Amino acid sequence: DVFWQWLATFSVFIDNPVNIGYKVAGYDLPQLNIQEIIVDGNEPIKETLTLTERRQARKDSLTLRCEKAAEIANNSDEQWLIWCDLNDESAKLHEVINDSVEVKGSDKPEHKSNSMIGFSEGKIKCLVTKPSIAGFGMNWQNCHNMIFTGLSDSYEQFYQAVRRCYRFGQKKPVNVYIIISAKEGCVKENIERKQADFLK
């Protein structure tokens, strides 16, 4: 705390060119639309589950969540970034989503780089992968639609994955779908709590 108080005595923080009279063009972000879809109920169950119970809930709803993701992506001509956390989710998503390319951790580096470059160039309609593989560092302003087929407890992974498309240079509103089972409500609440802590 003392360090930050000392820093505040002489520093100025500028988070946008508008703060010092410049135009915002190029540094403005489009609208971010986040929609939650609960595949097996109307309301998330907010009770705290053990890690084992949460894993079982994800396994139990895997087919429903993947089919819902496929319904959304297959009814669109636009590019889609499909995020998952489990290998079984990845395989099922690739199976049910038309024109999808799957990038797994066990893939050869050539496949990973060719797939990510192909997605960047618009040659791949749907890229199925994990935030731990492609959630950091990629610039995909060419895409403005993504689906999370479930969530992990990591706010950082969620934030970084969304920021692959929601970044400076993005010309269209970014649509983020979060597809979860009712029993995963506590995971989403945990992410939201971490986000609120981050923004304080």
Give, region by region, the residue ranges found by the protein language model.
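A conserved SF2-helicase RecA2
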Residues: 153-200
